[in-house]
Structure formats: C-alpha cells, structure tokens
C-alpha cells in the first residue's frame, strides 16, 4: 500500500486542509501520514475560532522522528497545502528534500495555497517563496485560477492562456499542473472548469456549479487529495483527473442536497471511491 505525507492545516470541527484530505485518500486505499501546520477548532469563515500554528522546527523534528524508526523510506509522496509562514515553507522544502533523499522514487505534489484558505491568510513572504522556490522542487502542482496567474506572472482569461501558463511553470520543474478551478470567459456560467496539463497534453473537464448560500470550505484540498491518491494507485494523469472531477462533484452535490455548509465526506464516501456520475475530459491545447 502506498504512503503519503500530507503537510497541511487541520480543523477539529469540519473539513479543511488535512481534515478534508486524509479520509478521502484513505478511502481510496492510500495510507496517510498527516502533519498539521495549523491546528484550529474550525475554519475561520465561521467568524470565531481557536488554535495556533505549529513551530516550523517541530515540523522537521517530527519527520526526523519518522526517519529515526526507519519508516521514512516507505514514504511514496509528499502533499503540501497551507503553509502559514516563510519558516513553515522552508521547513516543508527541507522535509521534501529529506524524503526524496531517503526514497529517490518519492514525488512531491504542491497545492500552492497563496490566498485565504478557510479564512486563514499566510504571513507576508509565503506567496513570494512559493512562486520563487516550489516549482523547481515540485513534481506536480495544483493551483486555482488566481494562484496559476501568480505562478505564471500573467493574466489568464481563456483555456488556451491557461494551458500556456501551465507550460511556463512546467518548464521550471513540475511534470503536471492540475488547475483546480479555472475561470474561462467562454464557458457557461453554470459550469465549474478544471484543467490538467503536462508537457505535451492537456485535458479540460466541467462539472455543474451549485449555487450554495455560502460555499463550503475545503473543496480545493479535497481535489488535490483525490488526484494524488489516484496517481499513487497507478492511474494515468487523465484517469486520475476524470476520477477527481467525478468524485469531487459527488461530494459537492451531496453537500448541496443535504443543505450543509461542511463537506459531506462520510456520507459521500462510496462516491469518492466509485463515482456514479462521470464527466469526461477532452483534449485541449495539445501540441
């Protein structure tokens, strides 16, 4: 069974960061080692919360502890999400380097959280660090539309522009870019666009966009987690993308139908593993 070290925020109540990522990856047959960068009572969109960030040095100490018992060599991938400070971001880089040195076959998937995540805003300097340092280290990245523009340093309004931006980033190191949410001026307003791009291929997919009174938090974290899990299970990029599109839709639909604010991960767990409604991806902007 594959193992992934997941470095993200965590909420006790609800689903954001590792609280949105761990169970879906486990449900898909992947062992998850959660390292929580932030421990909160709940996500901050509620307006009240309690909790704090973990010290960056302790992040590295925890991973050193795994290495000390000889288990780090079994880590097949690292997934990073919210990093609250430049010190945490640097610690994540050192952790990835340690994992890759221990297991040369391990890979790193970066969800470059640069804006507000569950109401949490990273400290000044995190965005600049991510843009400058992480593409060279990452084997894959999962930006949203805004983060893609920051990574590429350009405005994006169409699918073609998004594909070109992804290819700019790919030249710096990643083999695959998953755009978790793409705004396209040519797409229908009731559709949610996702895009995945490699050096030579690109696929776009759409799912229904639901009119929530207030949108649930953690959908992006769920998206990255499912994609990583399916890739660890051996799916091709396209197959992992299509499974991610379908499974995330199932969770979002279950949440909308139940009139809930927090993602209905447990209720929709069978759909995460075996989605009943699929949305085929089609080739776009391929060389």
UniProtKB/Swiss-Prot annotation:
A Pfam family recorded for this sequence: Phos_pyr_kin
Protein's name in the database: Pyridoxal kinase PdxY
GO cellular component, one term: cytosol
Keyword tags: ATP-binding, Kinase, Magnesium, Nucleotide-binding, Transferase
Chain positions recorded as ATP binding sites: 111, 142, 147, 180
Catalytically driven reaction(s): pyridoxal + ATP = pyridoxal 5'-phosphate + ADP + H(+)
Membership in a protein family: Belongs to the pyridoxine kinase family. PdxY subfamily.
Keyword DNA-binding: no
Function summary: Pyridoxal kinase involved in the salvage pathway of pyridoxal 5'-phosphate (PLP). Catalyzes the phosphorylation of pyridoxal to PLP.
Pathway(s): Cofactor metabolism; pyridoxal 5'-phosphate salvage; pyridoxal 5'-phosphate from pyridoxal: step 1/1
Highest taxon above the source species: Bacteria
Annotated InterPro entries: PM/HMP-P_kinase-1, PyrdxlKinase, Pyridoxal_kinase_PdxY, Ribokinase-like
GO MF annotations in UniProt: ATP binding; magnesium ion binding; pyridoxal kinase activity
Subunit structure: Homodimer.
Gene3D superfamilies xref list: 3.40.1190.20
EC number: 2.7.1.35
Alphabetical GO biological process terms: pyridoxal 5'-phosphate salvage
Organism: Burkholderia pseudomallei (strain 1710b)
Top EC class for this record: transferase
Binding site for substrate: 9, 44-45, 221
CC cofactor: Mg(2+)
